């Protein structure tokens, strides 16, 4: 199993934008077959060094992660939206 984590710092991190981004990220559930589990959390502390949203995706293998990265729904809907509303993102991928 592989865990894929992405943290996003939104250009405008008001409550509405955070909720909308969370909804877009969670919309992958059931639409991206290689994503076995998806969890999205919104930062509550709001410190200057905090990122606003964290996405966690669980996939079966490194090959499945590659398929996830290239999935049409992930690329055309989710990535497109998140790139439009984010000023920065970081990711971390590791085996379990």
Give short role names for the model-derived ranges.
Residues 80-96:
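Charge-dense polyanion-binding interfaces
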Residues 27-32, 73-78, 85:
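A common structural junction motif
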Residues 1-52, 60-70, 93-96:
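Short S/T/G/P-rich N-terminal loop/turn motif that feeds into the first structured element of a domain
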